[in-house]
Every structure is written in C-alpha cells, then in structure tokens.
Curated annotation (Swiss-Prot):
Pathway annotation from the record: Glycan biosynthesis; glycogen biosynthesis
Positions with a binding annotation for alpha-D-glucose 1-phosphate: 112, 177, 192-193, 210
GO terms, biological process: glycogen biosynthetic process
Entries under InterPro entries matching the protein: ADP-Glc_PPase (IPR011831), ADP_Glu_pyroP_CS (IPR005836), GlgC_bac (IPR023049), GlmU/GlgC-like_hexapep (IPR056818), NTP_transferase_dom (IPR005835), Nucleotide-diphossugar_trans (IPR029044), Trimer_LpxA-like_sf (IPR011004)
Keyword S-adenosyl-L-methionine on entry: no
GO MF entries: ATP binding; glucose-1-phosphate adenylyltransferase activity
Top enzyme category: transferase
PANTHER family: GLUCOSE-1-PHOSPHATE ADENYLYLTRANSFERASE, GLUCOSE-1-PHOSPHATE ADENYLYLTRANSFERASE-RELATED
Organism: Rhodospirillum rubrum (strain ATCC 11170 / ATH 1.1.1 / DSM 467 / LMG 4362 / NCIMB 8255 / S1)
EC numbers on record: 2.7.7.27
Name recorded for this polypeptide: Glucose-1-phosphate adenylyltransferase
Gene3D superfamilies: Hexapeptide repeat proteins, Spore Coat Polysaccharide Biosynthesis Protein SpsA, Chain A
Lineage top rank: taxon: Bacteria
Keyword Transport included in the entry's annotation: no
C-alpha cells in the first residue's frame, strides 16, 4: 500500500474519531430585533435555511457525523429546528447530532462565561464520546468548508491545535482576532482585534483573521481548559485567552481557509461571511439573487441540509399591464403567492403573500409575510410574520422610516411586527 493511500485511510479513521462542537449560544445583539425571539444561529437565511445549517452541513459533507450543539440564549427555536431537520443520522452506527443546553454542570453558579467555558462545562459529556480530536465551530457564520482537509493539515503538521484563518485586507482586520505567522504558518502571536494587524508573510497588505474554528488534540484540550478554569483573571474565551496563552508553548498552526474552502463554480475567492449586523445579513441574502452568487446553494456535491417543510410550489397569478404577478432577479421560496404584485431583486422565504399592485425591490422577507395592496418596499428586511398594511411605503423616505423603524447606516430598513403594530 503506497504512502498516499495509507495517509488517506488514517484521515478516514480520524474523521470517525473527531467530535464536532458547534457553539450556538450567542445572542447576536447586533442583529437587533431579528434575535429578540431566537439566537443568532437560529436566524433564517437564504430562503429556506437557518444559519446553524451551514456548519452542520459542512460536518455532514466532510464525513464528520458526530456533532454536538451547545446552546444557551433563547434556544427553543434552534432546538426545535435541529430535532425536526437533523434526525436522519443513524445513531446505531455512531452518527448523531446531540443538543447540549446550558446546565451549569460545574460548581459555578453562572451560565457560560465565554466560548472556552462553554466547552469546559461540558467536558464530562465530551469525554463520554472518547474523541481523538475535537473540532470547535462557531454556529453563526455562512461558509462552505471541507473539514476533512483541515483535519488532514492538522495531522500532517503534528499540531496540538490548528486555527482556521481567512485572509482579509489589513484595514478590515481590526474587528477580528488576528494571527501572526512565520513562513511555515506556525502561529507566533494571536491578537484580539488589534489596532495594527500583522501582515501575512509575502503579502503585507493582507492579514490572517481567525474564523473561530479550531481543531484540538483531545487530551491537549482537556489539559488547557482545566488550567484556564482555575485562572480567575481569564475571560475563558478561546480567542482572548486559550490560544494566546499557548502560543510559544504548544504547537499552534494556522490553516489557510483557501486550502479547504468549497468554492462556487467559476470562483476562486473563498466565501466566509459573519452576518452579525443587519447590513451584513441583508447583503449576504441579497447576493444570492445574482446570476452567479459568491455562495452557490445549487451545488449538489455539497448540499446544505435543513428541515424541509411540506409546502406547495410558489405561484404567480394575474397578467394584465397594471396587475401582473411577477418576479425577476429574485429567489421565491415554496408556499409563496405573488398575486398581481411585482418582486425585483428580492429574496422571499416560505409562505409570503405579495398582493396586487404592490412593489417589492431589493428586499428580504422572512417567512409568513403579507404585503398589502399598493404597498411599496425598497431595501428592507421584514421579520417573520410581518403584515404590511395596504398602501404603506417603506424605503423611499429615510427620515420618515427612521421615526417608525430601525434604519442602518447603509439605508436598510428593518421592519418587525412589533414596530408595525405601533403605526
């Protein structure tokens, strides 16, 4: 058996010995009213998915079938979604998605103090699965990544911990945890939101930003988490405390996202989005309606798995010059009825009704929206269940909109049922 085949067999074994932990307890306060009822990982995205589906699908498609989701803030919607949409795995052959709600499992009287504390409080559950490797993932980013390539890099380098990194312009890196590497991509410094991010060797105008994705050797992870838990000065966070404390002591290596990204057809720019603001959320959704979006949801070789509701096909009715049900340059999901209204450059989630003579332009409408007759919407996000009154105009007068709704710096208007009730 040649060396390449032996190495591949070792990776296949390693995938089965890997436990993925998805940190899904974040509130996502910068999304404002979109997270009033549910955590950020449970927020709908892309017409039919929830954000949590992306890291879970990456695990599934990469061959990692042992997944645990750590929840905390307003977890009911997230738990309900995973129970309905991710129950197809076969527990009898070691496949599962387990839900780990915050339970104060240690002697601390607080909930999770940070990302590292969330993992530390579940060490007993992790040890029960006896993993060789632990893959730690953020549950609130949109991207497609082959974790088997990340794991192969970790094993080949003999790392204690591997940090997945995406290169970004240096001027944009100040909002991220940044890593400084040597010529072999060994991490020599880890800096949380630095004012002057270090450049990449050979590319001084770019910086490595941590993606919040880590692979640890399990025994190494147990040791450093137990030590960190005793440190009263620590914030118990992987980016702020755990990784910086081990740089120079353990073998901490950077993994370039470009080496494991699942690319869209015809594109060589890695796609990774933190949709943590209203503007970023709108932009990432609206990008999907373009002819060749940066994120390919139509890739049958790397499907995004989710709960599939039983809904009828979308329907478009009425066809006269003044009353035509139509959509162009848009995504329209199952259960929608465009009844004599016009939809342009927009994304409609399931069960949205667009009534006659209305206009929807550059707008994201979450499930069960109803757009009244003669209403006009431009550059909006409508939260779940919004019912737009007949004749209401949003997105054309920013001063008036700001008095009634939240308007972002980029001019996106966030509309919610609670704000509509005050009109």
């Amino acid at each position: 058996m040649d060396q390449i085949t032996e190495f591949q067999l070792d990776i296949n074994r390693a995938l089965k010995e890997t436990l993925a932990l998805v940190l899904a307890g974040g509130r996502g306060s910068r999304l404002r009213d979109l997270t009033n009822r549910e955590s950020k990982p449970a927020v709908p995205f892309g017409g039919k998915y929830r954000i949590i589906d992306f890291p879970l699908s990456n695990c599934m498609n990469s061959g990692i079938r042992r997944m645990c989701v750590i929840t905390q803030y307003r977890a009911h919607t997230l738990i309900h979604h995973i129970q309905r949409g991710w129950g197809f795995l076969r527990a009898e052959i070691g496949e599962f998605v387990e839900l780990w709600p915050a339970q104060q499992q240690t002697d601390k009287e607080s909930w999770y103090l940070g990302t590292a504390d969330a993992v530390h409080q579940n060490l007993d559950l992790i040890r029960m699965h006896d993993p060789r490797f632990v893959l730690i993932l953020a549950g609130d980013h949109i991207y497609k990544q082959d974790y088997s390539k990340l794991l192969a890099h970790h094993i080949a380098r003999g790392s204690d911990c591997t940090v997945a990194c995406v290169d970004v312009p240096r001027e944009e890196a100040t909002g991220y945890g940044c890593v400084e590497v040597d010529n072999d991509d060994n991490i020599v410094h880890f800096l949380e939101k630095p004012a002057n991010p270090p450049g990449i060797p050979g590319r001084p105008d770019r910086a490595f930003a941590s993606m919040g994705i880590y692979i640890f050797n399990a025994d190494f992870l147990y040791e450093i988490l137990e030590s960190d838990a005793l440190n009263e000065a620590s914030q118990h966070d992987f980016g702020r405390d755990i990784i910086p404390s081990q740089v120079g002591k353990a073998r901490i290596v950077a993994h370039r996202f470009s080496q494991s990204c699942v690319y869209s057809v015809g594109r060589r720019e890695p796609y990774w989005r933190d949709v943590g603001t209203v503007d970023a959320y709108w932009s990432a959704n609206i990008d999907l309606v373009s002819v060749t979006p940066a994120l390919d949801l139509y890739d049958a070789d790397w499907p995004i798995w989710t709960y599939q509701m039983q809904r009828p096909p979308a329907k478009f009715v009425f066809d006269t010059d003044e009353r035509r049900g139509m959509a162009k340059d848009s995504l329209v999901s199952a259960g929608c009825i465009v009844s004599g209204g016009a939809v342009t450059g927009s994304l409609l989630f399931n069960d949205v009704r667009v009534n006659s003579y209305s206009s929807v332009i550059d707008t994201v409408i979450l499930p069960m929206g109803d757009i009244g007759r003669h209403a006009r919407l431009t550059k909006c996000i409508l939260d779940t269940g919004c019912r737009i009154p007949e004749g209401l105009v949003i997105g054309e007068d920013p001063i008036l909109d700001a008095k009634r709704f939240h308007v972002t710096e980029q001019g996106i208007t966030l509309v919610t049922p609670d704000r509509l009730a005050l009109l």
